[in-house]
């Protein structure tokens, strides 16, 4: 115990929630190295905080903060094990300090965050101490930190239930439009919170992903058509493609010629083809970009005007405001997304306890 101060023992106890004597022994074993002592207790199964940190954390909050000038914004997903803990004051303070640390040290990843200083110690130590105090595993799972040049606006939306957050960055040219772009970015963020687009644009998809999704989509439509046929309702068109990335110039030219050949066969005069073909092409593109309409932000129909896609809204605003608007970044966090929650089996639990 020589050279091991009471303050160091207390610090280790605060970080691990292990017993006082176990903390003393651990520090002696590793010659007073705090991090090695934490690892020692964890390996021995004596760190209660470490045990808590092994448990699945799928509740918590999504929180964001947008700068007053709308030139930067931060968003985090911080997980706890229960929604009850996510509502207590200690957890709320942790969320606040996390955002402050991200802003102060210009952090973009969870790895950077854990190493960053907070109150003269690494953030990771602070996090471990909060796990011990609060009594649940807490995990900073995702960080988004957007910064933009003067020609961009960044705005966001966090749902009141703190389970969904979105950040949107829009490029613009005309400074007088800045207030309108701020509002537009927030409205589009609200749309994305509700409609769950996976990516900004179809260019973010791989061709393999599109082909697999298209096969699933065709199977879904065929099944719907069976029911529609039974009920005497109109049938949906079966698409050949699923995304705009598949509609090359050659594909579109081939389809245009097919429509023209069809009109010729029907005996329609060539002088009226230009009035008919564009509408048919528009319908063809709509029928063959259903994956974009479901999964891309730009391809989805706007919740505030469901006759226009987000891309059309951006184009219309550009024209109306004499500007050239472009969505350059889109980030959406949904609490616990992708986390496999543990399913408790009460019967198995009782059986194990009886062995």
Curated annotation (Swiss-Prot):
Family recorded in the similarity comment: Belongs to the EF-Ts family.
Any matching Pfam family: EF_TS
Matches recorded under CDD domains: UBA_EF-Ts (cd14275)
Protein name, as recorded: Elongation factor Ts
Regions annotated as coiled coil: none
Chief localisation class: cytoplasm
GO MF assignments: translation elongation factor activity
Sorted UniProt keywords: Cytoplasm, Elongation factor, Protein biosynthesis
Domain of life: Bacteria
UniProt-annotated stretches for the region Involved in Mg(2+) ion dislocation from EF-Tu: 82-85
PANTHER family named in the record: ELONGATION FACTOR TS, ELONGATION FACTOR TS, MITOCHONDRIAL
Keyword Transferase applies: no
Cellular location(s): Cytoplasm
Cited SUPFAM superfamilies: Elongation factor Ts (EF-Ts), dimerisation domain, UBA-like
